From Swiss-Prot:
Residues 323-338 have a biased composition (Basic residues). Keywords: Elongation factor, Methyltransferase, mRNA capping, mRNA processing, Protein biosynthesis, S-adenosyl-L-methionine, Transcription, Transferase, Virion. The lineage of its organism: Viruses, Varidnaviria, Bamfordvirae, Nucleocytoviricota, Pokkesviricetes. Its main location: virion. Interacts with poly(A) polymerase catalytic subunit OPG063. Interacts with OPG109 and OPG123; these interactions might help linking transcription to capping and polyadenylation. Its EC number is 2.1.1.57. It comes from Myxoma virus (strain Lausanne) (MYXV). Gene3D superfamilies: Vaccinia Virus protein VP39 (3.40.50.150). Displays methyltransferase, positive regulation of the poly(A) polymerase and transcription elongation activities. Involved in the modification of both mRNA ends and in intermediate and late gene positive transcription elongation. At the mRNAs 5' end, methylates the ribose 2' OH group of the first transcribed nucleotide, thereby producing a 2'-O-methylpurine cap. At the 3' end, functions as a processivity factor which stimulates the activity of the viral poly(A) polymerase OPG063 that creates mRNA's poly(A) tail. This is Cap-specific mRNA (nucleoside-2'-O-)-methyltransferase. InterPro entries: mRNA_MeTrfase-like (IPR000176), Pox/kineto_cap_MeTfrase (IPR025804), Poxvir_cap_MeTfrase (IPR030375), SAM-dependent_MTases_sf (IPR029063). SUPFAM superfamilies: S-adenosyl-L-methionine-dependent methyltransferases. GO terms for molecular function: mRNA (nucleoside-2'-O-)-methyltransferase activity. The active site is at 175 (for methyltransferase activity).
Length: 338
């Protein structure tokens, strides 16, 4: 891992300031993974998104329709957090797979075991009227293989476009990963939105969340081309290969790895009904409560490889001035492209 100073993480795709040509051999690297990392990634992104809606006065009184929600373990944390803030929210969780039993028996949570298609979305629209809808989509292919094909992605994005156009949500968070240029089939459309980057995504994941707040005007779509695909691949590879393998030395926190730095800046935007002396103490509270909920061990900064062994210093009170130089130190590299 490379020790560097950074003022803030890249929160959105358009902030990534460099590119790197994709190296296929990266798929052979051993990924570094936390327990329940997928649920952690979803929880942080959705907590950030819903807190933004809370700030805009959109969340209270809404119905959150979450399509592709199973197993949804992390949703219990979100539900409990916003309930503790006094917000009235209904949750409608829809997936053809089984949900975590932790979500059963909650009077404000409806569990529906069903894979969604256009006909069902239109039926759902009638059921939801006149509710204010917040849409979260984590749809993925029903195929057996682990990685979706380009055709799977195009089908998913077509279905998400239907969700947005039919349900007319006040806001949405959609799953979004551009197909890779060497697997390109055709140009396609997605809604306009902010492309949010995700801490604790798999090591070489190019997946983002497409966040939108709608103002009642017609939904605007943008065309994605193969040229765009090349840009997405190079920028996301740079993010994963270079940026996410950094230790942020000016980040005053127990774990200075980049993903924790990214998480910190997300969690500091979250509201709480508790009083804290600083942003750091608030973030630490949420960090620890989320990790406890998901049963993830609390870790400190990973030791940098080739770090010199510390030696005893003479008892004489001497100090060396910092030479303020930056050294590139290589450490564990991560995973695979998804």
């Amino acid at each position: 891992m490379e020790p560097v100073s950074m003022d803030k993480p890249f929160m959105y795709f358009d902030e990534i300031d460099d590119e790197l040509e994709y190296e296929p051999e990266s798929v052979n690297e051993t990924p570094k993974k936390l327990p329940h990392q997928g649920q952690l990634k979803l929880l942080l992104g959705e907590l950030f998104f819903l807190s933004k809606l809370q700030r805009h006065g959109i969340l209270d009184g809404s119905t959150i329709v979450y399509i592709g929600s199973a197993p949804g373990t992390h949703i219990k944390y979100l539900r409990d957090h916003f309930m503790s803030m006094g917000l009235v929210i209904k949750w409608m969780l829809i997936d053809g797979r089984t949900h975590d039993p932790i979500l059963e028996g909650l009077r404000d949570v409806i569990l529906i075991t069903k894979f969604v298609d256009e006909a069902y979305i239109r039926q759902l629209k009638k059921q939801l009227y006149p509710s204010r809808v917040i849409l979260i989509s984590d749809v993925r292919s029903k195929r057996g293989q682990k990685e979706p094909t380009t055709q799977d992605l195009l089908s998913n994005y077509s279905l998400q476009n239907i969700m947005v156009s039919v349900l007319k949500p006040a806001a949405s968070s959609l799953k979004w990963r551009c197909p890779f240029p060497d697997q390109w089939i055709k140009d396609f459309y997605v809604p306009h939105g902010n492309e949010m980057l995700q801490p604790f995504a798999p090591s070489y994941s190019a997946e983002m969340r497409l966040l939108s707040i709608y103002s009642g005007t017609p939904i605007r779509l943008k065309c994605i081309t193969q040229q765009d695909s090349s840009k997405y691949e190079k920028k996301m590879y740079y993010l994963n290969k270079i940026i996410r393998n950094r230790i942020i030395i000016n980040f005053d926190y127990s774990n200075q790895e980049y993903d924790f730095f990214h998480m910190y800046h997300m969690l500091k935007t979250v509201y709480s009904n508790k009083s804290f002396t600083s942003n750091k103490s608030k973030v630490l509270h949420f960090h620890q409560s989320i990790f406890r909920f998901l049963k993830i061990p609390i870790t400190n900064t990973e030791k940098i490889h080739h770090e010199p062994t510390q030696r005893k210093v003479p008892s004489k009170n001497t100090m060396l001035k910092s030479r303020n130089t930056k050294k590139s130190v290589r450490g564990n590299k991560q995973g695979r492209r998804t």
